[in-house]
Swiss-Prot record:
Keywords: 4Fe-4S, Cytoplasm, Iron, Iron-sulfur, Metal-binding, Oxidoreductase, Repeat. Its EC number is 1.8.-.-. [4Fe-4S] cluster 2 binds at C54, C89, C92, C95. The keyword Repeat applies. This is Heterodisulfide reductase subunit C-like protein. One of its GO terms (molecular function) is oxidoreductase activity. InterPro entries: 4Fe4S_Fe-S-bd (IPR017896), 4Fe4S_Fe_S_CS (IPR017900), HdrC_iron-sulfur_subunit (IPR051460), Helical_ferredxn (IPR009051).
Length: 188
């Protein structure tokens, strides 16, 4: 398992908590990914067009779109569950726009996230986003209050950050999810 910082794993893999039969998942990983939203997964011809434009491939993530698709087709489930790449996808959708076979690598990446969530293999990037979502109402930290003021906008955006009741409601919803049971995000 790779480490982001010393002692901090990229992915906290709790797949051993899942109630599914592991061998069945390994046999059917491509079919499961298709069921989770990557309907055209098997149309990929590994041309590399998506990899040529993917920010994840450019910065060195191991299982960027093209490699992820190949690994899914080969059934390399365990290797993928331990990798943070699907959680790092920035959803730019460039891969989908350039794909000559309309595979939608973006959808493959998000289907992989769904599988990882079902298997409790939650990336540290996702956990940090969930912490921020619980604390501030945004999955991504909202910086730039000074910049907002300079251009005449309110200091806080019109979201849960400026609506305490909405933030309270969001926290109630999050407390009712499996996330609360796992205890990965502190919820007072």
């Amino acid at each position: 398992m790779e480490m982001m910082e010393e002692g901090v794993p990229d992915v906290i893999n709790l797949s051993y908590l899942a109630e599914r039969e592991e061998t069945e998942l390994e046999k059917r990983v491509a079919e499961i990914i298709k069921e989770l939203g990557a309907e055209r997964l098997m149309y990929c011809m590994q041309c590399g067009a998506c990899a040529s434009i993917c920010p994840l491939a450019r910065v060195g993530f191991e299982w960027y779109n093209k490699k992820l698709i190949k690994a899914l087709i080969l059934g390399l489930r365990d290797e993928l569950l331990d990798d943070p790449t699907p959680w790092a996808c920035v959803a730019c959708n460039r891969c989908t726009e350039i794909c000559p076979r309309r595979v939608s690598p973006f959808e493959v990446m998000f289907a992989m996230r769904r599988l990882m969530a079902e298997e409790y293999a939650i990336g540290s990037l996702a956990i940090e986003g969930l912490r921020s979502l619980y604390e501030y109402g945004h999955a991504v930290y909202m910086a730039g209050r000074e910049a907002r003021k300079k251009v005449g906008l309110p200091e806080k955006p019109p979201s849960t950050e400026s609506d305490p009741k909405a933030l309270e409601d969001l926290r109630k919803i999050l407390k009712q999810t499996k996330l609360a049971e796992l205890g990965l995000v502190p919820m007072e």
